[in-house]
Amino acid sequence: MLKEGQKLPSFKLNNQKGDAVKLPAKDMTLIYFYPKADTPGCTKESCEFQSNLKKFNKFETTVFGISKDSVQRQSKFAEKYKLKFNLLSDESEKICEKFGVWVNKSMYGRTYKGIERSTFLVGKNGKILKIWRKVKV
């Protein structure tokens, strides 16, 4: 599990266009993990990042969303809600596991693995500045 102050390990994931994106980026980076594209909470969260995108850009901060959804599902989600930032597909859950967001969850008495909604702010030096876990929307 990654912690504040640690250097972000480099990794590549495909975005909603199928292009490989390498992180960490050279700018400040905000990475948010969301459970599933086009569901109420994830849509609200993603649209909130989109509506604040100009503010992030002003501070030279690049926004990335990561979920287990396929590239195709990410593409439909981005298109439907006019999201102008990269949505990355981690179908293997490897990156989610590295970040410590692939966790045991339970609903209606059933236990399963899923993404814990979390956000990571990474500095230009590649170090994690702040982590918000168990984000509520």
Summary of predicted features, one role per range:
Residues 1-137:
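Chalcogenol-based redox active-site neighborhoods
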